[in-house]
Design a protein with these regions (language model features):
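Active-site "cap" helix and flanking loop/linker of ATP-utilizing ligase/carboxylase catalytic domains
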Residues: 262-285, 302-367
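Active-site nucleotide/adenylate-binding loops and adjacent lid/helix of ATP-dependent enzymes
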Residues: 26-27, 118-198, 228, 252-268
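ATP-binding N-terminal substructure of ATP-dependent carboxylate-amine bond-forming enzymes
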Residues: 19-111
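Glycine/small-residue-rich loop that forms an oxyanion/phosphate-binding "nest" at active or ligand-binding sites
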Residues: 100-110, 116-117, 123-130
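Internal nucleotide-binding/catalytic subdomain
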Residues: 173-295, 299-308
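Tryptophan (W) side chains
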Residues: 8-10
Length: 374
């Protein structure tokens, strides 16, 4: 499926080279998010390599048709200075651990720490254990028990596949009948393959949703500016959940106090908890939050840049991403500077998305667009 992401800038941005020493940077992943990451590194003057095929990146970097298993050997043979892992799957698979064992500098959490995204059940268990505010929930690996519990709840209600499902494993059911149907699809009919073998059933939260991403070095937390993405496929918050149909920053409805509450009651307690559990977190921790009438609550944790939030945030970032990544790895302090401009990104997806979409469609007119396209 061909997906085009384009980011409209409201003000003219002048890019400057933030790092005078050219380094070899390898970006794992080839989507819009990874294009934005590679673009940022290129603007800083670095030599770009990408694992995966991205025609736009191939114009200013080198795209590699190699497997995940071949990455360590390639890095050693080609003296790669930094590996930046974009997607969640390689992180959950433990790619960063393997690279570190080979003496290769890699940005991202360990396999154990990546469980925060790799398992909704694990994430919820950690939130419950350490009193991190979230929706009321129960988790199940037995369909009959899950169905019986669901029958006693009220709609709307949220069903979450335990494992990775490319951002589509969350179902907001408007009726219990729909919820029972989706539960059976997940647990009995393998709608999300093995990812739905276990599920989380949780209350539906109402409020203003926002994405709080932080650079994290063990117990040190460096919040980014916040962004908001739109997950539903259609206008007016309708349609199925997707990986994200657009994003913008900053947000007017979220205050500095809301952000501080998110950091102090959600992100900081979680990274402290991970460290205490022997799974120190290094990389990007994404907290999907909801500003409710009774305070900020946690919807989910991810262990990498949000997509499409990444595309707008990296255009807004006025600090060196290369320096940030290395300082996080080394446990050094990070200084984040941001442009004052506002940014909005719109995602164009193949017809039929997020269900089985059309493939091979030709996208025309890109040369007429005077704005970054990822």
């Amino acid at each position: 499926m061909h997906v085009m992401r384009k980011v409209w800038r409201w003000y003219l941005v002048k890019f400057v080279t933030l790092n005078t020493n050219m380094a070899k940077v390898l970006v794992v992943g080839a989507g819009g998010r990874e294009h934005a990451i590679a673009y940022k590194f290129k603007q800083e003057g670095h030599e770009i390599y990408m694992v995966g095929v991205n025609p736009a990146v191939n114009k200013f970097g080198t795209c590699l048709n190699i497997s995940e298993e071949e990455i360590p050997e390639y890095c050693v043979n080609n003296k790669i200075d930094l590996v930046f892992v974009g997607p969640e799957v390689p992180l959950v698979n433990g790619l960063v651990d393997i690279l570190h064992e080979k003496g290769i500098r890699a940005f991202g959490p360990s396999k154990k720490a990546a469980q925060l995204e790799g398992s909704k059940v694990f994430s919820k268990m950690m939130m419950k254990k350490y009193n991190i505010p979230t929706a009321k929930y129960e988790s199940f690996s037995d369909y009959e028990k899950a169905s019986q519990y669901l029958a006693k709840q009220k709609a709307p209600i949220v069903l979450k596949a335990d494992g990775l499902a490319a951002g589509k494993g969350v179902i907001i059911a408007e009726s219990l009948e729909d919820a029972q149907f989706e539960l059976k699809e997940m647990m009995c009919n393998a709608k999300f393959s093995k990812a739905g073998a276990s599920v989380v059933i949780e209350e539906f939260l109402q409020g203003e949703e926002f994405s709080l991403m932080c650079f994290v070095s063990d117990k040190k937390v460096y919040p980014m500016e916040i962004a908001q993405d739109h997950k539903r496929a259609f206008d007016n918050d309708e349609g199925l959940n997707t990986g994200g149909m657009g994003a913008y920053c900053p947000l007017r409805k979220i205050t500095k106090d809301d952000i501080e509450e998110g950091v102090q009651k959600v992100v900081q307690p979680m990274v402290d908890a991970m460290s205490n559990e022997g799974m120190p977190f290094y990389g990007i921790l994404y907290a999907g939050l909801m500003k409710c009438s009774d305070g900020v609550k946690t919807i989910e944790f991810n262990v990498r840049f949000g997509d499409p939030e990444c595309e707008v945030l990296l255009l807004k970032l006025d600090s060196s991403l290369y320096d940030i990544a290395n300082n996080i790895i080394d446990g050094k302090d990070v200084n984040l500077q941001w442009k004052s401009d506002a940014y909005i990104g719109v995602v164009l997806a193949a017809k039929g998305y997020p269900k089985k979409g059309e493939k091979g469609a030709i996208i025309k007119g890109l040369e007429k667009v005077n704005t970054p396209i990822f």
